[in-house]
Amino acid sequence: MIQQQTYLNVADNSGARKLMCLRVLGTGNCTYGGIGDKIIAVVKDAIPNMPVKKSDVVTAVIVRTRQTVRRDSGMSIRFDDNAAVIINNDGNPKGTRVFGPVARELRDKNYTKIVSLAPEVL
């Protein structure tokens, strides 16, 4: 569950290292976001001389959460960290690589480019 003020790791090579969630998009009154939800975030830590700078406001997709996700098959999955991938207005990732595993729920939400860049899909 990701809510306002939650810090997330960045799982791509866009130049950002840490994000802070400002708003979860598309959830109505619910203030929590899960895997596959879009968020508005601010970059809190960034690598120098990269396209994404510190204090930039970006759109990202949540790819991993520490909160357990229950699937329809009865299986549950949980990751070691909260992580997101920075995307542009078209929904494509800004980086060219995705680090670490991502959840299968991203494929259902039509983030196939992120799934194809990921080294492992759980």
From Swiss-Prot:
<keyword id="KW-0689">Ribosomal protein</keyword>
<keyword id="KW-0699">rRNA-binding</keyword>
<dbReference type="InterPro" id="IPR005745">
    <property type="entry name" value="Ribosomal_uL14_bac-type"/>
</dbReference>
<dbReference type="InterPro" id="IPR019972">
    <property type="entry name" value="Ribosomal_uL14_CS"/>
</dbReference>
<comment type="subunit">
    <text>Part of the 50S ribosomal subunit. Forms a cluster with proteins L3 and L19. In the 70S ribosome, L14 and L19 interact and together make contacts with the 16S rRNA in bridges B5 and B8.</text>
</comment>
<comment type="function">
    <text>Binds to 23S rRNA. Forms part of two intersubunit bridges in the 70S ribosome.</text>
</comment>
<dbReference type="InterPro" id="IPR036853">
    <property type="entry name" value="Ribosomal_uL14_sf"/>
</dbReference>
<dbReference type="GO" id="GO:0003735">
    <property type="term" value="F:structural constituent of ribosome"/>
</dbReference>
<keyword id="KW-0694">RNA-binding</keyword>
<comment type="similarity">
    <text>Belongs to the universal ribosomal protein uL14 family.</text>
</comment>
<keyword id="KW-0687">Ribonucleoprotein</keyword>
<dbReference type="GO" id="GO:0070180">
    <property type="term" value="F:large ribosomal subunit rRNA binding"/>
</dbReference>
<dbReference type="InterPro" id="IPR000218">
    <property type="entry name" value="Ribosomal_uL14"/>
</dbReference>
<dbReference type="GO" id="GO:0006412">
    <property type="term" value="P:translation"/>
</dbReference>
<dbReference type="GO" id="GO:0022625">
    <property type="term" value="C:cytosolic large ribosomal subunit"/>
</dbReference>
<dbReference type="Pfam" id="PF00238">
    <property type="entry name" value="Ribosomal_L14"/>
</dbReference>
<protein>
    <recommendedName>
        <fullName>Large ribosomal subunit protein uL14</fullName>
    </recommendedName>
</protein>
